[in-house]
Amino acid sequence: MSRKGHIKKRDVNPDPIYNSKLVTKVINVIMQDGKKGKAQTIFYQALKKVQLMTKREPLEVFRDALNNIMPVLEVRTRRVGGQNYQVPSEIRPERRQSLGLKWLVKFTKQCNEKTMKDKLAKEIVDASLGHGVSVKKREETHRMAEANKAFAHYRW
């Protein structure tokens, strides 16, 4: 343990178009090799495509999608008496959001559309409707936590 105190949490600046910190976080997750401009272009074009597909406010659709992706429970490995147990535990809100964003981008890249903006738009719309690969990942995580509920008393 470090004796120099706690590390201060860095705050992200809101993006210029939607004035939202959440959008900046998504752009930072999409970004590769420091190419933020390209990541912004991809995300903003994907939101335009989402608006065309759903005829709704794109940021609302994105928030609905993220709420459907963010997990509430996860399993963590705990070693007790020479055995490893998968112990279900709640996830704090910041980690829920970051996991949701990472899963969204990860499963978007695995999609078989032509361009990244098309893949991202399709995954956002699917997730907002409650289906899609990233929503399945959340359900799978919750299923694992439910199956290991018997070990919840090992929580720390």
UniProtKB/Swiss-Prot annotation:
InterPro entries: Ribosomal_uS7, Ribosomal_uS7_bac/org-type, Ribosomal_uS7_CS, Ribosomal_uS7_dom, Ribosomal_uS7_dom_sf
GO cellular component: small ribosomal subunit
Stated family: Belongs to the universal ribosomal protein uS7 family.
PANTHER family in UniProt: RIBOSOMAL PROTEIN S7
Subunit structure: Part of the 30S ribosomal subunit. Contacts proteins S9 and S11.
Superkingdom of source: Bacteria
Protein's name according to its UniProt entry: Small ribosomal subunit protein uS7
Disulfide bonding pattern of the chain: none
Function: One of the primary rRNA binding proteins, it binds directly to 16S rRNA where it nucleates assembly of the head domain of the 30S subunit. Is located at the subunit interface close to the decoding center, probably blocks exit of the E-site tRNA.
Pfam families noted in UniProt: Ribosomal_S7 (PF00177)
Keyword terms of this UniProt record: Ribonucleoprotein, Ribosomal protein, RNA-binding, rRNA-binding, tRNA-binding
PROSITE patterns: RIBOSOMAL_S7
GO molecular function: rRNA binding; structural constituent of ribosome; tRNA binding
Signal sequence interval, chain numbering: none
Organism listed in the record: Phytoplasma australiense
GO terms of biological process kind: translation
